[in-house]
């Protein structure tokens, strides 16, 4: 999972910007070992409720759940977080292998639609990073416009950022 590839230290301030249903958030919360804070956000009210339940079931006590669009959070938490995880909503091409029925629902314009949404999420996620903070961006699609395209775009917008390879 993306959370398993994102080193989090106890005491850090961590944001999971697209957190529901909570698998990534519970892993991040466990890594914090009760120290620091985890903000787990999802824009869907019903998904945020499921997220809250999962964090409670796993006993993550230093987390709170928000149900906000990224721009609203960025206005309140500018430069606040040490780490920001964005497992962005996407066109889902990576699900084709797991669920062939997904292929039938795919539409040609979906990657462009999601790339636009991802850029907005990325822009606001970066705003919430403290100087020197780290952001991990992931999707479950193969569409270059949603992966390399979104990363190239944010690096152009934020020249102070650098790409760090993950092994």
What do the predicted segments below correspond to?
Residues 1-167:
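S-adenosylmethionine
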């Amino acid at each position: 999972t993306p959370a398993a590839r994102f080193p989090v230290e106890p005491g850090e301030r961590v944001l999971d910007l697209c957190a529901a249903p909570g698998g990534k958030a519970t892993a991040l919360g466990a890594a914090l070992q009760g120290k620091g804070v985890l903000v787990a956000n999802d824009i869907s009210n019903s998904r945020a409720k499921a997220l809250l339940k999962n964090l409670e079931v796993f006993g993550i006590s230093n987390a709170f759940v928000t149900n906000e669009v990224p721009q609203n959070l960025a206005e309140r938490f500018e430069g606040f977080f040490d780490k920001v995880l964005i497992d962005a909503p996407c066109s889902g091409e990576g699900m084709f292998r797991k669920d062939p029925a997904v292929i039938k629902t795919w539409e040609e314009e979906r990657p462009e639609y999601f790339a636009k949404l991802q850029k907005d999420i990325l822009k606001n996620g970066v705003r919430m990073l403290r100087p020197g903070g780290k952001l991990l961006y992931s999707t479950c699609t193969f569409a270059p416009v949603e992966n390399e395209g979104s990363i190239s775009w944010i690096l152009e917008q934020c020249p102070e950022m650098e790409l760090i390879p993950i092994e």
